[in-house]
Amino acid sequence: KIQKKQEPVMVGLNFTHAEFWNPAKCDFELYQCLPLALQAIRDFFTKEYQREIGITVTSTYRPNDPINFPAAHRIPPPAVDSVASDVNLRNEIISRIRSEFKRWEKSELVRNILKTGTNVLIIENTCLHLHFRKENLSFHPGYECEHFYIGEWGVKDGKQFNIAYS
């Protein structure tokens, strides 16, 4: 359970609970794989840019989401949405993540995220949506995590789209 805002989410990670918790809402549980996946993303882009690249969590638990919205953020443990902390790099990083998702079979980034147990990786417009679920997943025999979904959701030219990369 996330309760103390300034404590690390997990030992060895540079995330505090404040990045996942909104004081206006109640405490919630978080899948351990999600901060590990975010750390894998931070590490990947820090190595690539050869400087510290921050990832900001923009959304987690939203219990007041309308019922017609997907339950990923409404029901704990919730999904997390995130963006690059550096506004100037957001489009570039999401574009790079999109490229990694499209070539997921050979992607070090995707492999490192899947190793954490995170099995839902979706680009949603301008953010990255990460989650763990047990249904509506594709089966990929031979992978460390065989059941996962990698894709992209969004709106383009006023029309919604959903692309599955895996």
Protein language model features and the residues they cover:
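Short secondary-structure junctions
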Residues: 45-54, 108-114
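Active-site nucleotide-donor binding segment shared across nucleotidyl transfer reactions
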Residues: 53-74
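A structural signal for short, well-ordered beta-strand segments and their strand-loop junctions
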Residues: 50-58, 122-123, 131
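Generic low-complexity segments that are intrinsically disordered, proline-rich and/or Lys/Arg-biased
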Residues: 4-9, 24, 64-67, 71, ...
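Active-site acidic/histidine clusters and adjacent loop/turn architecture
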Residues: 1-52
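Catalytic cores and adjacent binding grooves of peptidoglycan-active enzymes
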Residues: 71-166
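Generic hydrophobic secondary-structure signal
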Residues: 3, 34, 38, 55-57, ...
